[in-house]
C-alpha cells in the first residue's frame, strides 16, 4: 500500500497533468503547478474519492499546496 503522501502526489500529478517528480510537498497548486480554479475543485473531488472523505468547501479553500493536502488527509483519516 502506498503512503498517503505518495497517493496525494499521484492524484495531483494526474489531475494537473504534470510529472509525478515535479510534485513536491512545498509546491502550490496554482503558483507552481499551473492549476486554475476548476483544476483545484477537481483535485479536491479526486482526493475525496481516493480517501473516502468529504472535504467541506471552507476546508478545501485552505488546501493550496501539496503538503496542505497531505496534512488534511492525515488529520481526517478514520
Swiss-Prot record:
Pathway(s) per entry: Lipid metabolism; fatty acid biosynthesis
Top-rank lineage group of the source organism: Bacteria
InterPro entries: ACP, ACP-like_sf, PP-bd_ACP, Ppantetheine_attach_site
Processing and modification events after translation: 4'-phosphopantetheine is transferred from CoA to a specific serine of apo-ACP by AcpS. This modification is essential for activity because fatty acids are bound in thioester linkage to the sulfhydryl of the prosthetic group.
Signal peptide: none
Function according to Swiss-Prot or TrEMBL: Carrier of the growing fatty acid chain in fatty acid biosynthesis.
Annotated HAMAP family: Acyl_carrier (MF_01217)
Protein name, entry field: Acyl carrier protein
Organism this protein belongs to: Pseudomonas putida (strain ATCC 47054 / DSM 6125 / CFBP 8728 / NCIMB 11950 / KT2440)
Gene for this chain: acpP
Amino acid at each position: 500500500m502506498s503512503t498517503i503522501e505518495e497517493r496525494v502526489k499521484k492524484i495531483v500529478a494526474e489531475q494537473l497533468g504534470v510529472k509525478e517528480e515535479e510534485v513536491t510537498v512545498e509546491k502550490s497548486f496554482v503558483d507552481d503547478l499551473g492549476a486554475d480554479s476548476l483544476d483545484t475543485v477537481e483535485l479536491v473531488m479526486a482526493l475525496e474519492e481516493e480517501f473516502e472523505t468529504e472535504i467541506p468547501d471552507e476546508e478545501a479553500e485552505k488546501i493550496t499546496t501539496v503538503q496542505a493536502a497531505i496534512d488534511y488527509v492525515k488529520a481526517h483519516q478514520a
